[in-house]
């Protein structure tokens, strides 16, 4: 849908949404986002210019339906997919993409690390995707030298970064905030470095005894990004991997650097969001969100979870959705989903579904808590359908209509029960929603309630009704 929009921009030195917004131009993408978010176009333009909102929209991803990530927009959800050397293939990843979009993913990250032709998989995903696609280029940089850190040089990183831009990647996780001076701070951790990209760069610095090349070449990366309107997702290489390590010196030192890099990217009119933890106790989530806003000048915050306990492998879509809802309430702009397979293995299609639904619940709960206009409309509509025993309407309004209908039909599968005024929980005689209090029922109660002895009189009225 965007081919005609971007044609006139091709060849310009800077085609980023931030660049146009700062010139007072409302792009077609901004206008589209304004309609989706029910926001004034002028507000979208101002928020993009300020850096509080991003519209990840590479000019080479022409099939994209533009969306916004930021404090002024609805809380968004990202789904991770990707092939590994030990599991999955290209066809399965495209199927995961389609499933993720079906269940409401606002963006999708291709985290493929090997085992397939990475360029082929990525291109297939971008061509099939109406939502923004993100990547982590250091994975392919390492794969391009067959996993040999000692053979990886600075130009390899930049070559892969530009290749991803050329292919239409909308945002890239760039682990530029991890500095060589941060590495000693990791020693006291329980789980060290848990970011794959961060681990690669830590190994590179330890082997070469040189500063992080993504930091030293950051301005070069900005020059690449602004030619394609690729957005930075500044990676948190030192995110905590357990409750013990949350909010420690290593994490906060990197966060400070991420804030500095945010402002450097903005100086190039390049869009930025900042990634965050991770594993964080409930009582530290508000601090983490507010600290990021302070250090990073309110650039959109994008968190993985966070998980609020470490003892539930197999259920980490739940442990993390609890933290995600709270993070969203406090102002996080996008939540990266976690599946039941987290810490255990590569997720399959059903895991993608489970993780996404858990996170759509968390994001929606955050929007309600933040009193976003219209956020509760669907809840109220479903509640009316529930009160009126309109089963099909309830299924239709559910985040996962198939699952809702499946669970209802396990015990009452016949079509006649779609008109029944009960479910199998209460049965036909005990459902409290069958009690419909009407004006006729209330006749005479007003006067009783006005008297001093109203409570006693009312008890009598109730007894008479019951008899």
Curated annotation (Swiss-Prot):
EC numbers on record: 4.1.99.17
Organism superkingdom: Bacteria
Coiled-coil spans in chain: none
Pathway info: Cofactor biosynthesis; thiamine diphosphate biosynthesis
UniProt remark on cofactor binding: Binds 1 [4Fe-4S] cluster per subunit. The cluster is coordinated with 3 cysteines and an exchangeable S-adenosyl-L-methionine.
Binding positions for Zn(2+) per the UniProt entry: 279, 343
Official protein name in the record: Phosphomethylpyrimidine synthase
Organism of origin: Synechococcus sp. (strain WH7803)
């Amino acid at each position: 849908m965007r081919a005609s929009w971007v044609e006139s921009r091709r060849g310009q030195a800077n085609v980023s949404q931030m660049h146009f917004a700062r010139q007072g131009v409302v792009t077609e993408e901004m206008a589209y986002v304004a309609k989706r978010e029910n926001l004034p176009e002028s507000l979208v333009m101002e928020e993009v210019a300020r850096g509080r909102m991003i519209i990840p929209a590479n000019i080479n991803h022409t099939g994209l339906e533009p969306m916004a990530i930021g404090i002024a927009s609805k809380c968004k959800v990202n789904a991770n997919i990707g092939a590994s050397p030990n599991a999955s293939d290209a066809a399965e990843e495209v199927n995961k993409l389609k499933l993720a979009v079906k269940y409401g993913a606002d963006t999708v990250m291709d985290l493929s690390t090997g085992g397939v032709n990475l360029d082929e998989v990525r291109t297939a995903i971008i061509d099939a995707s109406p939502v923004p696609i993100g990547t982590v280029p250091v994975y392919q940089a390492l794969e391009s030298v067959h996993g040999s850190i000692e053979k990886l040089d600075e130009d390899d990183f930049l070559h892969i970064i530009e290749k991803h831009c050329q292919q239409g990647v909308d945002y890239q996780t760039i682990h530029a905030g991890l500095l060589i001076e941060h590495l000693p701070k990791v020693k006291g951790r329980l789980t060290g470095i848990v970011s794959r990209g961060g681990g690669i760069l830590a190994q590179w610095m330890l082997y070469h005894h040189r500063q992080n090349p993504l930091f030293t070449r950051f301005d070069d990366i900005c020059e690449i990004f602004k030619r394609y309107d690729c957005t930075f997702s500044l990676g948190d290489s030192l995110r905590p991997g357990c409750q013990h390590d949350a909010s420690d010196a290593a994490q906060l030192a990197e966060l400070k650097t991420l804030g500095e890099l945010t402002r450097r990217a903005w100086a190039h009119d390049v869009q930025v969001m900042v990634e965050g933890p991770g594993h964080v106790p409930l009582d530290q989530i508000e601090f983490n969100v507010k600290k990021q806003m302070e250090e990073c000048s309110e650039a959109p915050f994008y968190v993985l979870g966070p998980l609020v306990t470490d003892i539930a492998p197999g259920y980490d879509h739940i442990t993390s959705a609890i933290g995600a809802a709270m993070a969203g309430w406090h102002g996080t702009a996008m939540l990266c989903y976690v599946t039941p397979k987290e810490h255990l293995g590569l997720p399959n299609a059903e895991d993608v579904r489970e993780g996404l639904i858990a996170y759509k619940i968390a994001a929606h709960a955050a929007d309600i808590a933040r009193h976003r206009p219209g956020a509760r409309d669907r809840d109220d509509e479903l509640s009316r359908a529930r009160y009126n025993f309109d089963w099909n309407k309830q299924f239709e309004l559910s985040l996962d209509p198939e699952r809702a209908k499946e669970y209802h039909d396990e015990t009452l599968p016949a079509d006649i029960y779609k008109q029944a005024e009960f479910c199998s929980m209460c049965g036909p005689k005990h459902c409290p929603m069958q009690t419909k209090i009407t004006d006729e029922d209330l006749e005479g109660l007003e006067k009783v309630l006005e008297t001093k002895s109203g409570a006693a009189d009312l008890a009598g009225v109730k007894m008479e009704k019951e008899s």
